[in-house]
């Protein structure tokens, strides 16, 4: 498995280059004005770093030791970003983050990879302040039945080569199930179906 993790990390930026160019303005819009205490879930290779406001206090977590090496190279010295080699469901985070303490939690192209993403969203909910917001940019399940069938067939293999990425998750439904309320949400397509938005408690 570590072979695929290492390969995925080494090729991630080049593989995602076209998609990330199309997402640049959306990432910037979602992130650049956020201030206060922020949790960046699954930093990957550090794509979000350039968009963080200089005054924000960012805790950025990434479970892949290969991804985090890429992310370290992108850490801007003028910003307050602390990077940790942790997953969101690791017990260490429970000691680092108090309930009702975060202003924002950012999940961009990461909920597809977290093994227990329902638990992750439950933790995010309890860590956010009553006025806190969840910021989302995720690919989700297909809308049409035949596309869902194809996703379900492909998913087991894709999950291996894609470092745990699931093509077919109902992330939009799970967010609402946890109790989040949308301030803004949008569905759109970039080959896959995507879901972005801002959610309160």
Residue positions per predicted region:
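Conserved class I S-adenosyl-L-methionine
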Residues: 1-35, 47-48, 67-70, 158
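C-terminal alpha-helical "lid/dimerization" subdomain adjacent to the S-adenosyl-L-methionine
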Residues: 15-19, 137-189, 194-195
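Class I SAM-dependent methyltransferase SAM/SAH-binding core
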Residues: 39-93
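Short glycine-centered segments of the SAM/dcSAM-binding site in methyltransferase folds
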Residues: 57, 131-133
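A short acidic, Gly/Pro-enriched loop at the edge of an enzyme's catalytic core
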Residues: 89-105
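A short SAM/SAH-binding and catalytic strip from SAM-dependent methyltransferases
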Residues: 103-116
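A short glycine-rich, Lys/Arg-flanked "PGG" loop and its adjoining helix->strand segment in the class I
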Residues: 118-130
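C-terminal lobe and adjacent flexible extensions of AdoMet/dcAdoMet transferase-like proteins
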Residues: 196-201
């Amino acid at each position: 498995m570590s072979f695929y993790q290492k390969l995925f990390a080494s090729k991630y930026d080049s593989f995602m280059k076209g998609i990330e160019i199309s997402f640049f303005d959306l990432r910037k819009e979602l992130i650049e004005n956020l201030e206060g205490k922020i949790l960046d879930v699954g930093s990957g290779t550090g794509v979000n770093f350039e968009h963080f406001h200089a005054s924000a206090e960012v805790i950025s977590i990434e479970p892949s030791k290969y991804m985090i090496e890429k992310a370290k190279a992108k850490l801007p010295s003028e910003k307050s970003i602390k990077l940790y080699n942790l997953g969101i469901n690791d017990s260490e985070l429970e000691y680092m983050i108090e309930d009702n303490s975060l202003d924002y939690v950012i999940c961009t192209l990461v909920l597809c990879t977290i093994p227990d993403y329902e638990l992750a969203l439950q933790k995010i909910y309890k860590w956010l302040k009553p006025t806190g917001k969840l910021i989302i940019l995720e690919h989700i399940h297909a809308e049409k039945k035949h596309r869902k069938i194809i996703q379900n067939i492909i998913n087991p293999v894709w999950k291996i080569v894609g470092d745990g990425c699931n093509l077919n998750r109902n992330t939009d439904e799970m967010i609402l199930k946890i109790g989040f309320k949308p301030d803004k949400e949008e569905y759109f397509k970039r080959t896959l179906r995507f879901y972005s938005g801002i959610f309160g408690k």
